[in-house]
């Protein structure tokens, strides 16, 4: 419904915010259970529920914006502002990870023998999988920019082609990151080094998963002709988010892989 004394669309009662909040809390608790009891079934269930809730929430937003036309100029500006604030909040989250890592590496504790990395930890070669992952993400940043360029020029086939390439590159990045974790000879519980590394790279990996889902949904919307060269705010926000992920990875690579090695 719309009030005539203001330009903003008043949302109907939606169950998705409270369900997402409860599910996010359960997801964090289940991750703690994984660290202590090595049991991940509850975590996988929470992850699947999070994906389902996100899809249903996206469905309602798409219906309100594309089919009902309730997202006017003011609402689109508010959505962009919300995305900027969200990215800033995520930036400060990663700053805390970098701060923690640099603090402990520049002044190692006596508990780990005043060494960084601690003894008996063989770290990854930064010129192997980490460098390949860096090239993959930089390439994906280039392909998503090309996709946006072709969208602005109303060349939908080329735009969808480069968007597909970006999605494939993101999935390949996640595969290589999983492979790297399997090859590691240290775990999350191996001193402050292991927890710092897995917290930072793990959270980045989770953001890559979210960004990939975001891109896949925009790919489906592009196929269904939801976007035009003038109106594609969802696609534009996913590009912002993807560039943010790429920039964070560059700092992760330079700090956690290159400088640390």
Regions found by a protein language model. Name each.
Residues 1-261:
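Core, highly hydrophobic multi-pass alpha-helical transmembrane subunits of bioenergetic inner membranes
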